[in-house]
């Protein structure tokens, strides 16, 4: 009996080991530099006194950064604050434009609470939260070389825009418990702080970029966090610009009186969510609005 119990404990221990150390590293092509961005424009706003966090100091600093107002196609706006150490407004603007575009590749749901961006030199980790995204350009070079700059922004923006809304929600906590495992060591070590951000990128990959990851990777994600995946599905997050906002046109509408079955088909986008807008007047059945997750290009 003791031998059996010991074996059982060993098996459980192996099952509980997370499949990844950190999820920003699982695949560099989940978001590509060529993917669409909601970035629209950048307007100079001079310089002004601001309080910024600098990881090189491990503290808050008061500076007079170069200021830029980034505007996005979904109506969101961000003030980009560039450390004056970059020397002049032109060089600061280059940094602001560079990262404003990449941030625009994030979905509306991830940018909705981002009010400011801090840009410093230095090889220090990025950060999210405080209605902000923190960038150290030396570290950005490393992320770019590894192909994970965009994936890192997804992680950090999840902290900024999703943590406060969901990390302490009873349904999220219930999903964690139901899964019984963590997607990464980082999530396991800091379940309250990092689990949501660590889980969201893999979720995004299987739902919206399934063609860019291996089947084995997708299987591993689905097996490890199935209930967290269901939780994210339930949120109906605004996925623009990954998913276009225009409702697709119905290309077939057929009613079988014999079967009392109404069949509707439309050209869908893989990963998009749809519901049918119900009406007793068939003349208004012209478009499909967003809940059913599309698995093929024809739904």
Task: List the predicted regions and their residue ranges.
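Short, composition-biased motifs enriched in small/polar/acidic residues
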Residues: 246-299
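Sec-dependent N-terminal signal peptides
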Residues: 3-12
């Amino acid at each position: 009996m003791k031998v059996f119990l010991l074996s059982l404990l060993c098996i459980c221990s192996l099952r509980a080991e997370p499949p990844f150390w950190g999820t920003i590293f699982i695949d560099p092509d989940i978001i590509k530099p060529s993917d669409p961005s909601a970035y629209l424009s950048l307007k100079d706003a001079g310089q002004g006194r601001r309080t910024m966090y600098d990881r090189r100091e491990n503290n808050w600093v008061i500076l007079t950064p170069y200021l830029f107002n980034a505007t996005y196609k979904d109506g969101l706006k961000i003030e980009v604050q560039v450390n004056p150490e970059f020397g002049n407004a032109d060089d600061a603007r280059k940094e602001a434009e560079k990262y404003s575009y990449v941030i625009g590749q994030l979905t509306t749901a991830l940018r909705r609470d981002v009010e400011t961006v801090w840009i410093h030199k230095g090889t220090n980790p990025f950060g999210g939260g405080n209605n902000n995204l923190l960038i150290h350009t030396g570290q950005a070079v490393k992320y770019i070389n590894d192909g994970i700059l965009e994936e890192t922004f997804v992680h950090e923006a999840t902290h900024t825009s999703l943590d406060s809304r969901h990390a302490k929600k009873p349904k999220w906590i219930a999903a964690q418990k139901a899964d019984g495992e963590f997607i990464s060591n980082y999530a396991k070590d800091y379940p309250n702080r990092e689990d949501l951000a660590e889980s969201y990128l893999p979720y995004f990959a299987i739902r919206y970029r399934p063609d860019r990851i291996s089947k084995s990777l997708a299987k591993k994600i689905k097996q490890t966090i199935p209930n967290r995946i269901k939780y994210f599905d339930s949120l109906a997050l605004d996925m623009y610009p990954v998913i276009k906002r225009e409702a697709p046109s119905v290309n077939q509408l057929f009613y079988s009186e014999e079967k009392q079955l109404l069949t509707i088909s439309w050209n869908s986008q893989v990963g998009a969510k749809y519901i049918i807008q119900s009406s007793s007047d068939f003349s208004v059945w012209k478009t499909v609005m967003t809940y059913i997750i599309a698995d093929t290009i024809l739904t």
